[in-house]
């Protein structure tokens, strides 16, 4: 599906396929998918467990290689990059947010956010400055020195979002980012996503929850490795954010 009303897409995939196994055991987790995503767009890809949405996200983010097809980010063909090139791509161009947070337990919130900036080549001083700026942006400047074990689920996910932004990525990919959160924490995180999208950052979120998908600009339904439906959403993100968390409108 190739809907794009904002000029050249920042993400483009053509004929994207991911296969596992062989012969009678061959499974196509992603089956000849085409996708365009515009700059500043919030796209939700939804579907049941096992439909291929997380596999697709991993392909778009360079965490896995496709069996066939092409992936482009701002005119650069990602699927042809070397392993070293893919590592650089993941480090500088993409921010990842996962359901399980994946924070380092022995590091403070600030140190978790600093780490990708340091790995990306920033000086310790610049990494600290960037981490403080991002923790303030996600409303956790007063929790900078806390270990993840001392933070709530919503706070840990906000740290993870700050970490994803440490190297100013072109796009953020989120895999069930609110799956482990209660309603209040879900609303908290989705409001943050909405603010970042409004500021021009591009998001792709995969989810099985229609309420979460309804907070995006566009929603694609996926089943058995293929796109089966697409909808442009115009209902207003603030109302959708409140409704998705069950907190009223």
List where the protein language model places each region.
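ABC-family P-loop ATPase nucleotide-binding domain
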Residues: 1-19, 232-249
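ABC family nucleotide-binding domain
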Residues: 9-227
């Amino acid at each position: 599906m190739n809907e794009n009303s904002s000029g050249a897409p920042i993400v483009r995939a053509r004929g994207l396929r991911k296969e596992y196994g062989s012969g009678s055991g061959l499974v196509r987790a992603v089956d000849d998918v085409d996708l365009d995503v515009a700059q500043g767009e919030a796209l939700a890809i939804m579907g049941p467990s096992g439909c291929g949405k997380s596999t697709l996200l991993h392909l778009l983010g360079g965490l896995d290689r496709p069996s066939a097809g092409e992936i482009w980010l701002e005119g650069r063909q990602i699927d042809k990059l070397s392993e070293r090139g893919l590592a650089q791509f993941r480090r500088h161009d993409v921010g990842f947010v996962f359901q399980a947070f994946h924070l380092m337990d022995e590091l403070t919130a600030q140190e978790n956010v600093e780490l990708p900036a340091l790995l990306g080549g920033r000086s310790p001083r610049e990494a600290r400055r960037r981490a403080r700026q991002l923790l303030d942006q996600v409303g956790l400047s007063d929790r900078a020195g806390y270990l993840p074990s001392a933070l709530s689920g919503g706070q840990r996910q906000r740290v993870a979002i700050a970490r994803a932004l440490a190297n100013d990525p072109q796009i953020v990919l989120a895999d069930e980012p609110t799956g482990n959160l209660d309603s209040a924490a879900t609303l908290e995180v989705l409001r943050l996503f909405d603010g970042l999208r409004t500021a021009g950052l591009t998001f792709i979120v995969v989810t099985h929850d229609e309420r979460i998908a309804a907070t995006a600009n566009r929603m694609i339904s996926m089943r058995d490795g293929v796109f089966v439906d697409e909808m442009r959403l115009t209902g207003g993100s603030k109302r959708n954010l409140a409704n998705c968390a069950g907190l009223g409108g």
